[in-house]
A protein has these predicted regions:
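The feature captures the beta-strand-to-loop junction immediately N-terminal to the Walker
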Residues: 42-44
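Helix-to-loop junction immediately C-terminal to a conserved catalytic motif
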Residues: 57
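Conserved ABC ATPase "signature" region
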Residues: 95, 99, 106-124
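Conserved ABC ATPase signature
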Residues: 128-135
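ABC ATPase C-loop
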Residues: 146-147
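Catalytic Walker B motif of ABC-type/P-loop ATPase nucleotide-binding domains
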Residues: 153-157
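ABC transporter nucleotide-binding domain
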Residues: 169-250
Length: 286
């Protein structure tokens, strides 16, 4: 991809604030997206993931802060809606997107053939996009965002709702684009996917709770965790959650009398959960 020639480029955003009326969607959020790396943005519904990605892609402007991105024609964007036209064939969808990118017919045909082959969609080139499976449609949407070989690709939950085999195929496409020098920012609700990324930004209610490599986020988790089969009582219940058939409890100030249960080492899923609990604790919500 052409992004390989910009291996030192670092895209991203600084101190973004976005409001929808009286609702603050992002408040002081920053992110870096170096070339050749995959950056994950994680968080629950309403965390601000899509708003941040729209700002990065140039689809909207923040009320405050700066966005560093290549020119719009050097940016690829997959919105949550996918942007695929169901009444066009697979090939026609790519041709339509290529025209929007200003690609010549010859280059468009060459790239379409290349990316259809990468995605395993070449046999389906003549099928209507509306007749594809969910996984195939997402593959089409992802390669449409990659077709012009941009320097920055922004993907809003590209693997949500697809089968495990299609998820694996989508990640192969994403990893290859990064290996070829493209900077990739993606939103995901799957923390196992975030663990594969170079860096992770954790959002909650428009606020950045944590950022860094997956290992750095885990290492920075405050307090300690314990696991038990029994439901925690009292104040500990507000700091507990179920996972893999057991209760996990976060102790902000661990000590000899922290509580019952077995001490465990956290992973990224635990660290993200604790980051949200720590914010609630600071806000006096429990």
């Amino acid at each position: 991809m052409s992004g390989a020639g910009t291996a030192t480029a670092v895209w991203g955003a600084s101190d973004l604030r976005v409001s929808y009326g009286h609702v603050v969607a992002l408040d002081g959020v920053s992110l870096t997206a170096p070339a050749g790396q995959v950056t994950a943005v994680v968080g629950g519904d309403g965390a601000g993931k899509s708003t941040l990605l729209r700002c990065l892609a140039g689809a909207m402007s923040p009320g405050r802060g700066q966005v560093r991105r290549p020119a719009k024609e050097r940016t690829g964007y997959l919105p949550a809606s996918s942007g695929i036209y169901p009444d066009l064939t697979v090939a026609e969808n790519l041709d339509f997107r290529a025209q929007g990118y200003g690609m010549s017919r010859q280059l468009a045909a060459q790239r379409s053939a290349e990316y259809l082959d990468r995605a395993g969609l070449a046999p389906a080139a003549g099928r209507l996009a509306g007749q594809l499976s969910g996984g195939m449609r997402q593959k089409l949407a992802v390669i449409a965002a990659m077709l012009h070989q941009p320097e920055l690709i922004v993907l809003d939950e590209p693997t949500t709702g697809v089968d495990p085999v299609s998820r694996s195929g989508l990640w192969w496409l994403i990893a290859r684009a990064a290996a070829e020098g493209c900077a990739i920012v993606l939103a995901t609700t799957y923390l196992d996917e975030a663990e594969r990324c170079t860096s992770v930004l954790v959002l909650d209610a428009g606020i950045a709770l944590a950022s860094g490599t997956p290992a750095e986020i885990v290492a920075a988790m405050p307090g300690s965790l314990r696991s038990s089969q029994q439901r925690p009582d009292g104040d500990a219940f507000a700091r507990s959650w179920r996972r893999a058939g057991r209760w996990r409890t976060w102790d902000p100030d661990p000590g000899p009398g922290a509580g019952d249960g077995q001490a465990i080492e956290p992973d990224l899923q635990d660290a993200v959960t604790v980051a949200a609990l720590a914010r609630q604790l600071r806000a006096g919500e429990f």
